[in-house]
């Protein structure tokens, strides 16, 4: 590999068969996404179309973009609207100022063209609208030094709609507006994205922050590996301070300013997610979420606030909630559609685009349904990292593979139990464990 750190456009030549390994390297420390790997591979194939024996060239900026795209797509693959997903991909790709200027104009153009083909042209139009609008028109109020409070103004939606009205239906326009509105809305708490990409490109602010506890890709001396910074796990004190019997608004948040871990509840059209963010915590999407009839839009740190709301918010989403653990705790998307398999009447499916298709039954014994082709190996290492556990092979079974955990510490067991209580589920519905 040619990897001169001083080069403006470092070229990395790799065999196409190595693309998946590259994506995995770029996303080290996170759960892999098979679908995203396919997407990146296809985009590279169509973008480059080299015809030179299966080799492609990626400059460093493109490698950085792949990493960024992988992270954001992992967030955005909840939607069932393919055009919406691809529209978001366009915006994520072109909102990086590195792709708006030379020498990456060709890459940007190719990316838009590729996604235009799959998203009914919204890529080009959305880019044109955003590119031609000033930061003020976009409505990035309070960006400057107070970038954390940057929001998109309601006024900015009118010119976007007007400029796109002739070509696109209202539904598509709404989706395009939602892309901009959502990513730059403080209510959605996607501030790391706004800080590192959107504000960098549209408002010309240069500010680099950690995203989900992971630095932007850099090359280590000698090894040329992508380096990441791990975020500390949830503290035992935060878990012990939790009082599930108190309503959300009666919880004590006095320690919020000192916590290092933040959570966001984001209700989408067909799922509910809780995700860690690295700066501030917001509950709600735009105008907040409704819990027990109370409209909430809170900026709170830490874990304590979450569980009472989760306990109520997830009631209708039982019995399936997939647990992902990475540098903290991430409770991922209850998937509301039952599996269409006669052999698994009570199973619910976790979509493949999240990690891989994992089927849990809700019998409470923690087993995986027999028709699962996946394994929990992708989840357990994250759990092991959180609780500093050791993996063994005697607790959870999936197909012919048995995977489990042993040598728990008290903190890890406490976390698993609280998670189960918060969702009014048996902890063994999520994972089977026995303290040794």
From Swiss-Prot:
It comes from the Viruses. This is Uncharacterized protein S7.
